[in-house]
Amino acid sequence: MSFIREILRAIRITLIFWLVTAIIYPLAILVVGQGLFPIQANGSIMENIEGTPIGSTLISQVFTSEKYFHSRPSAVRYSQGRKAKPTGISGGSNLAPSNPALLERIIEEANQLRDENVQPIADLIYSSGSGLDPHISVQAARQQLERVARARGVQPDEILLAINKFTDGRFLGIFGEPGVNVLRLNYALDLQDINRQQN
């Protein structure tokens, strides 16, 4: 009888923990997230002026046009193109510093930047650990400033104001380095172009 009572107690405890961890806790987090942080809880999706989603401010994407600031290189190629990994995968290349494939990729990135008259700095030739980092350093943004200003036909000072506006500071004021969110910056520049054309 004692053995059966212990089994029933174990089943009850298992059901209680299942109820708490599989239903109550996730629902509580869902309610708190949607109530206090609705934008972040739904992926921080940015929409254009027509209401069409253009990306997430948390996940980088490829920008190839001269009039856009370019993101960091991605080992997963942002799930785009022939060599891309499927959507949902993130991570670095895990190539050793002695691997010729890594050196070849870095040289290719550096040459492409030189063709654009951009000084190849670390942010612009090395991929981030996740391969999806939405930020570049302020220095990397300033390196691309002249190219973007020339392609958009505006003064570099105008672009510099936008860079400063979309620079996120250090986390809690002490952790990490300031970074520029590439999607937010590029979209703000597009909006400036639209406003300029309407005036």
From Swiss-Prot:
It is found in: Cell inner membrane. Its main location: membrane. InterPro entries: KdpC (IPR003820). The chain crosses the membrane at residues 13-33. The keyword Cell membrane applies. One of its GO terms (molecular function) is ATP binding. Keywords: ATP-binding, Cell inner membrane, Cell membrane, Ion transport, Membrane, Nucleotide-binding, Potassium, Potassium transport, Transmembrane, Transmembrane helix, Transport. One of its GO terms (cellular component) is plasma membrane. It is a single-pass membrane protein. Pfam families: KdpC. Coiled coil: none annotated. The system is composed of three essential subunits: KdpA, KdpB and KdpC. Part of the high-affinity ATP-driven potassium transport (or Kdp) system, which catalyzes the hydrolysis of ATP coupled with the electrogenic transport of potassium into the cytoplasm. This subunit acts as a catalytic chaperone that increases the ATP-binding affinity of the ATP-hydrolyzing subunit KdpB by the formation of a transient KdpB/KdpC/ATP ternary complex. Belongs to the KdpC family. This is Potassium-transporting ATPase KdpC subunit 2.
